A protein has these predicted regions:
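Single conserved hydrophobic/aromatic residue that forms the stacking wall/gate
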Residues: 1-12
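Phosphate/pyrophosphate-binding betaalpha-module
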Residues: 10-51, 55
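Hydrophobic/aromatic beta-strand patches that form the interior of the parallel beta-sheet core
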Residues: 13, 82-84, 110, 137-141, ...
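Short helix-capping/linker segments at secondary-structure and domain boundaries
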Residues: 33-43, 106, 193-206
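Active-site phosphate/pyrophosphate-binding segments
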Residues: 36-135, 216-219
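C-terminal active-site/capping subdomain that shapes the small-molecule cofactor and substrate pocket
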Residues: 123-208
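A short, charged, Gly/Pro-tolerant segment at domain boundaries
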Residues: 207-219
Length: 219
């Protein structure tokens, strides 16, 4: 499938992949478009990041990032995941985590963004505190580029709801590149979802319910 064509380059996506599994191909496609339109060097940056990501995961199951994903997965277990973010970058990551947990692990996950969470959702933790502790887990996706007020909001959120629900803070900061941080967080989330699928004994590739819905919508 050709996504972009110009005198400079063509980008093709490998056939047969589900969209979530084509993340790398699609990221490359968008980067090539931006490079042509804005005369930038995103593709070169991606090549550098690709080597970095390969190194992170070169030890497979024994890699530090996979071990971290297993720790997070063990904390999640059968709980509903609520993911909070506070910057544009962490919003992208939290959205990816949500959909990967939904699709790969067939588990419930939802997202909220600071400061919006403080205008409404923060109150939802006041009722049924025992049920919240038993059935939910909150994940903070942190970003080294957070505004000081967002940092403060995260700390206050932890203080206000920490006794009502377990909280995991994911704070991966790469001083060299925001892109490296973003893709490392994406990799971590993907591994969390796959390890959670294994723990819950579900097939990450199965999308029967979505296919059934498509058929029903088609009449």
């Amino acid at each position: 499938t050709r996504y972009f064509s110009s005198a400079a380059s063509d980008v093709y996506k490998r056939q047969g992949l589900q969209p979530r599994a084509a993340f790398g191909y699609l990221t490359l496609a968008v980067s090539k478009i931006i490079d042509v339109v804005e005369n930038s060097n995103y593709v070169s940056q991606l090549n550098d990041v690709s080597s970095y990501i390969d190194k992170l995961s070169e030890n497979g199951d024994e890699s530090d990032i996979n071990k971290l994903s297993i720790d997070i997965c063990e904390s999640i277990n059968k709980k509903t995941v609520i993911i909070y973010s506070g910057t544009d970058m962490s919003r992208v990551v939290s959205s990816r985590w949500k959909t990967q947990i939904n699709e790969n692990a067939k588990s419930k996950a939802f997202i909220g963004n600071l400061p919006e969470v403080h205008h409404n959702e923060i109150l939802s933790w006041d009722a049924d505190k025992d049920g919240s502790k038993k059935n939910y887990i909150v994940i903070f996706i942190r970003d080294q580029n957070e505004h000081p007020q967002i940092k403060k909001r995260f700390e206050l959120t932890k203080d206000l709801i920490g006794e009502k629900v377990d909280i995991i803070e994911v704070n991966i900061a790469n001083q060299e590149s925001t892109l490296k941080t973003l893709l490392e967080l994406v990799l971590l989330g993907d591994l969390v979802s796959l390890n959670l699928a294994a723990k819950l004994a579900v097939n990450p590739n199965n999308i029967d319910t979505i296919e059934k819905l498509k058929k029903l919508l088609g009449g």
